[in-house]
Amino acid sequence: MFKSNFEDYYEGGLATIESDNNLNNKKFDTFDVKKLTLDSFNFDQKIGFIKIDVEGHEFSVLKGSKKILKKYKPVLLIEIDKQHSSKVKETFNYLKELRYESFYFDGIDLIKILSYEENIRTDFKNFIFKHKE
């Protein structure tokens, strides 16, 4: 069975990580894999909601979904964790360029994020992005 430092870090859990992750500066084995973008699929119906939980690959997924985001303007629920990627700010800025507003849910209310700050509360990892229409 394949075992990596990532499994050690997460006590047996295995997921993908971005090569520029911030997990205690540990080194990991890398593998080339074929990827498909969401834009490469032909969807027959309107897409109203997309959930993204890709352990640091959020920015790549969004870039590969640009046509869908522009055409359908779906609501996005994205798990973003600073320890998995250095592209957190780029992710927020990219969606802002596409006219998305960002929010987080504090357990009671939906709170609008006016701008991404490096010191954004780290206990919030699930962010909601809604297109301005």
Range-by-range predicted roles:
Residues 1-45:
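Glycine-rich adenosyl-binding loop in Rossmann-like folds that engage adenosine-containing cofactors
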